[in-house]
Every structure is written in structure tokens, then in C-alpha cells.
């Protein structure tokens, strides 16, 4: 109980007040970047239509101290309904990838081609872990404050949101849902890092990802032995109690080669670890009597064919939670 109380106090420090919407959202997206700013001065400095419905935004972010990219897929009725506000689906990338990964590796553009939802795929750094670092970038502020406000003020994003992510992005989806109650109506994790302190191996995976990208691993959440409460405040399993009321979907394999792997594929340690972390979170949710849709599908590696399959499997639930009927 003491740990939960301390975590709640830590969360209180990042509780966000949802900003009011401003008038004057645009009807046509082509052309110059929209002249809107977030409360802290973050702004879209350029936008590029890179494919049908696909818009890349370059954002000057005070939270990060640099520019960052976000890719959005516009709803198919964007132009036909110039005053509409759109439900939002955030898709979070994994370690060592970027904001282009979902459109590059999956059929998400086709999947959402008949569905009136704004799909948002933000940059999170190769090792950002969807967190405000103790010493470094403030990714959580960038995503949940700056980007959210810019989308609401310039790109007609509404107040109903779902979020999903793979690997490191699975941690982000569940962390953001737990740390900002009510911001997201549904969350999904595919092979997610859902218990970063499950074992020394789990801790080492986080610190090795950070150090392999040239950063001090203690700059993220501190020394895990000396600052366990900071780690707990960013660990989905420790935050599970705050997920009550959010529609949840969790999926992972066990690292053994499965039906979507090519011949000769070997055992995958990353998915084995993330499968164990996912199982631990599922056990915690059951202990707390928090419902979730669970797909612990056994053989399967830490790879895109499984993540795309689970995106399809979770898509109807994610859309239903934000009041959208998907076209299939």
C-alpha cells in the first residue's frame, strides 16, 4: 500500500488538465503548416503529404529541446466533413525504430482506409521509453501535452482516444493510459515491455537499450537499485491498478518460432522475455479483477507479422471504445 501511495503521489506531479479546444481548425490540409501552438510554445514548423492520407509533421518541441516528427493518417472523410472532430488512434513504435514504422511495416493505411479515425504515429526516439527522463528528453510531455494540443488545435483531433504499441510502445500505451486516467478509452500492447522489473534480465534489457544508443542508462529512471519507486512509477505492472475502466488488449508470444516465421527461424529471446512480462501483467490484472482481452498465443517471435496480426485482432475493440464503426 505504501508503494502504491508513493506512485500515486508521483503521478499527481504529472497529472494533466485537458486543454480547451480552440476555434478555427482547417478544412484543407494541403499547404503550409497550421499556425497553432501548444501551451508551452510547441509548434508545427512544416508538414508534408507523403502519400494519400499520409501527412508528416515536423514539430518544434520545447519538451525535447529539438524538432520531432509525427506521421498522421487522415480520416477518409476529412475533406467531406470540414468541421468534424475525429476520434484518435495513437500507434507507438518500438525500440530503435521511428515514426514511419507502422506505415512501412504494416497495412495500417489500408486497415483504416474506410474508418473515420485520425491515426497518429509519433516519434519516440530509439530509446525514449515514453517517459520524461530524469536527465534528458521529456517524451511523455511531448506526446500527452504538446502533440495532443497541436492535433486538437490544428488537425481536428477529438477527445476520444485509443492507443496501441509494440514492444517499447506497448509499455508506452499502458503507461500513458495509467498515468493519465481518462485520456485514453482503450489500450493495446503487442509483445510489450509490461514488467520492466520482472527479473534482472528485464532490467538489463532496458538499460542495454539506452546505453546502446549512447546514453547513460541512469538518465532514464535512475539506478534501479537506488530509485526503485521511479522505475515503479513507469512500470505497467506496478501501475495496473490505474488501468481500471480502460478497455485493454494484451498479446504476446513465447519466443519459439511460430506460424508467421520463415523456415529456419530460431528462438527469440526478446519475445520470450516480453511474453513473460505480459503474462505477469495479465496475472496482476486478474488479481485486481480488471478485465482484459488476452492473446498469449504461444509460438511467435518479436516481429512485425505478429504485431500486424494483433493490430487487426484488436482493431474492432479499439474502435468500439472510441465510438467508431470500422469498415471491413
Question: Where are the predicted features?
Answer:
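N-terminal export and membrane-targeting signals
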Residues: 1-17, 156
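Non-catalytic cap/lid and distal C-terminal segments of serine-dependent acyl enzymes
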Residues: 9-10, 24-328
Amino acid at each position: 500500500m505504501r508503494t502504491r501511495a508513493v506512485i500515486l503521489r508521483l503521478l499527481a506531479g504529472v497529472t494533466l488538465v485537458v486543454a480547451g479546444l480552440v476555434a478555427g481548425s482547417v478544412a484543407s490540409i494541403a499547404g503550409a503548416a497550421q499556425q497553432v501552438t501548444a501551451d508551452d510554445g510547441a509548434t508545427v514548423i512544416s508538414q508534408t503529404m507523403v502519400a494519400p492520407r499520409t501527412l508528416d509533421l515536423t514539430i518544434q518541441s520545447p519538451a525535447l529541446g529539438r524538432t520531432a516528427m509525427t506521421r498522421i493518417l487522415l480520416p477518409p472523410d476529412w475533406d467531406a466533413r470540414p468541421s468534424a472532430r475525429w476520434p484518435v488512434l495513437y500507434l507507438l513504435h518500438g525500440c530503435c525504430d521511428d515514426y514511419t514504422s507502422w506505415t512501412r511495416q504494416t497495412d495500417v493505411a489500408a486497415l483504416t482506409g474506410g474508418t473515420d479515425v485520425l491515426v497518429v504515429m509519433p516519434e519516440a526516439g530509439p530509446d525514449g521509453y515514453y517517459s520524461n527522463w530524469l536527465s534528458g528528453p521529456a517524451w511523455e510531455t511531448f506526446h500527452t501535452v504538446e502533440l495532443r494540443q497541436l492535433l486538437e488545435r490544428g488537425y481536428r483531433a477529438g477527445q476520444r482516444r485509443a492507443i496501441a504499441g509494440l514492444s517499447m510502445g506497448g509499455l508506452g500505451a499502458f503507461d500513458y493510459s495509467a498515468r493519465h486516467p481518462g485520456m485514453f478509452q482503450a489500450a493495446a500492447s503487442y509483445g510489450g515491455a509490461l514488467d520492466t522489473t520482472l527479473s534482472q534480465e528485464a532490467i538489463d534489457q532496458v538499460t542495454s537499450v539506452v546505453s546502446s544508443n549512447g546514453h547513460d542508462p541512469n538518465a532514464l529512471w535512475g539506478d534501479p537499485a537506488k530509485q526503485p519507486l521511479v522505475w515503479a512509477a513507469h512500470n505497467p505492472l506496478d501501475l495496473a491498478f490505474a488501468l481500471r475502466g480502460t478497455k485493454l488488449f494484451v498479446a504476446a508470444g513465447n519466443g519459439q518460432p511460430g506460424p508467421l516465421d520463415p523456415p529456419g527461424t530460431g528462438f527469440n529471446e526478446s519475445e520470450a522475455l516480453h511474453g513473460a512480462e505480459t503474462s505477469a501483467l495479465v496475472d496482476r490484472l486478474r488479481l485486481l479483477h480488471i478485465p482484459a482481452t488476452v492473446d498469449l498465443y504461444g509460438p511467435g517471435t518479436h516481429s512485425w507479422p505478429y504485431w500486424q496480426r494483433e493490430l487487426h485482432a484488436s482493431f474492432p475493440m479499439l474502435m468500439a471504445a472510441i465510438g467508431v464503426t470500422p469498415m471491413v
